[in-house]
């Protein structure tokens, strides 16, 4: 841990770091300046950007495991990727990145000069970082973390105990922001100092964490108080419920190499005006493609055309491969649907799907996630509300998200349906044929399955962390297969502690017991 935290407070040039699970981010490569001279707004902006992106696209593995993507034919892949025999360095970048962000957030808190709006944002982002670390690894350093001089080898805290404190941190963050009447943070590139939207974000985040433990017989001690406070705040302040209240982060992306949205630049080379090699590396996963196709038994799930592209100019030619099943080539595998049309042209301004334009924001938390969280909580009698109406709003919001941006008539033989997201969503949800448990909340025999299935497909290309947690705590959706590589074990319930901890914090990491992928997180099944 000492190596992790040595320069925590001065990592100001990490905005471009993708935190891919396959890359070790070595913080010792940075040449830090004196942190005492740094404007906290210049620290806040990159933290919001990086925390949003690592959750959005920081792990290819979770997108594979959740049935969204697979690896294209012709790409060299070691078998350990498919059968989960990777080593302790595989998720090391995730660990080091989150602790780096936490250290920078602590710097903001220490230099806020009494501005409680900054402090409320810091507490909120701390919760995002810590809960994602727990959801991946289990027990982690918490109370002694970020105190390198006092605790060079910090002890690990019990994950459930940390969650209990995270609820309290969110209560505190909400109060700090609601009661603040002074200057707003200039570095707030998510809500531009809108207190009401920050409170909605906090409420939605707290509901996410409430649902994590909702099926446990014994809840964390502060759970009841947190839920009471959440219900009181939600009654007056609400949850994320629209594009305007979504947690979207944008530092000012524009059409220049290194300055565009990082997801877009992953697939589109701005300076060369062409696709990158990543476009052919990532292919559609059969689990998601087949789910979208189920809708075509009736009205049709036209999100398929916004998420994936036909592999040729026949509009019915969609195909995915299961992760772990080797493919010889990409000729009959769909890639991502992106740009201005399926033939690969991309102006950088008028796209659809998840790759719309170079200046699109990074989603931290979307309205459709919020609606599905509320729908599950209402169905489970945790919060008041009409779970059917909330579910329908979630589906509509996801259709709108994927349709947003222009959808011109493409060249070739591909014909798209009318660009009316709400009408298509409503038609999709009123189908009476096909696997109605997947989409019709009025006819389903298992509303929870329907809610979680739509939440899963809606998070495709948006946030694989959340469905990975849902699957481990509920077992839904059942058609998530992880890897179909011959002999591959069950989907990991957690990931290994990083090798850097074994090198620098040996006794404390070993005190956590056997470091295996089959050990469930405290809220897991």
Q: At which residue positions do the language-model features occur?
A:
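C-terminal functional modules
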Residues: 398-525
């Amino acid at each position: 841990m000492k190596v992790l935290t040595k320069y925590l407070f001065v990592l100001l040039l990490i905005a471009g770091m993708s935190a891919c699970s396959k890359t070790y981010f070595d913080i010792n490569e940075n040449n830090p300046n004196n942190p005492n001279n740094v404007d906290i707004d210049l620290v806040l902006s990159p933290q919001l950007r990086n925390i949003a992106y690592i959750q959005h696209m920081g792990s290819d593995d979770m997108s594979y495991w959740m049935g969204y993507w697979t690896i294209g034919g012709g790409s060299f892949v070691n078998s350990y990727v498919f059968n989960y025999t990777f080593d302790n360095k595989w998720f090391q970048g995730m660990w080091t990145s989150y602790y780096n962000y936490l250290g920078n957030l602590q710097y903001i808190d220490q230099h806020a000069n009494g501005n409680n709006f900054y402090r409320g944002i810091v507490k909120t982002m701390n919760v995002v970082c810590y809960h994602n670390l727990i959801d991946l690894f289990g027990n982690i350093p918490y109370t002694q973390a970020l105190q390198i001089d006092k605790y060079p080898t910090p002890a690990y805290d019990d994950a459930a105990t940390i969650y209990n404190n995270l609820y309290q941190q969110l209560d505190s963050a909400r109060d700090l922001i609601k009661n603040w009447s002074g200057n707003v943070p200039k570095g707030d590139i998510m809500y531009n100092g809108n207190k009401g939207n920050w409170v909605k974000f906090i409420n939605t985040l707290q509901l996410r964490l409430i649902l994590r433990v909702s099926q446990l017989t014994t809840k964390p001690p502060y759970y009841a108080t947190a839920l009471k406070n959440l219900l009181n705040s939600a009654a007056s302040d609400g949850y994320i419920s629209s594009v305007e209240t979504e947690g979207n982060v944008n530092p000012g992306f524009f059409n220049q190499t290194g300055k565009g949205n990082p997801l877009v630049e992953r697939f589109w080379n701005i300076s060369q005006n062409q696709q990158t090699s990543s476009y052919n590396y990532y292919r559609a996963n059969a689990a998601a493609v087949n789910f979208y196709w189920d809708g075509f038994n009736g009205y049709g799930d036209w999100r398929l055309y916004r998420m994936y592209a036909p592999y040729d100019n026949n509009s019915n030619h969609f195909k995915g491969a299961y992760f772990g099943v080797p493919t010889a080539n990409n000729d009959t595998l769909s890639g991502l649907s992106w740009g201005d049309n399926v033939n690969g042209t991309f102006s950088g301004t008028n796209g659809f799907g998840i790759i719309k334009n170079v200046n699109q924001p990074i989603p931290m938390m979307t309205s459709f996630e919020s609606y599905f969280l509320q729908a599950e909580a209402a169905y489970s009698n945790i919060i008041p509300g009409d779970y059917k109406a909330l579910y329908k709003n979630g589906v509509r919001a996801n259709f709108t998200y994927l349709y947003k941006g222009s959808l011109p008539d493409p060249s070739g033989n591909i014909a798209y349906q009318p660009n009316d997201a709400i009408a298509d969503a409503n038609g999709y949800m009123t189908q009476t044929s096909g696997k109605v448990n997947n989409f019709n909340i009025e006819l389903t025999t298992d509303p929870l399955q329907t809610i979680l299935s739509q939440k899963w497909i809606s998070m495709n290309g948006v946030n694989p962390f959340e469905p990975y947690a849902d699957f481990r705590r509920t077992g839904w959706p059942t058609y998530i297969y992880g890897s179909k590589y011959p002999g591959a074990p069950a989907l990991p319930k957690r990931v290994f502690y990083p090798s850097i901890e074994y090198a620098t914090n040996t006794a404390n990491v070993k005190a956590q017991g056997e470091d295996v992928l089959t050990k469930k997180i405290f809220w897991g099944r």
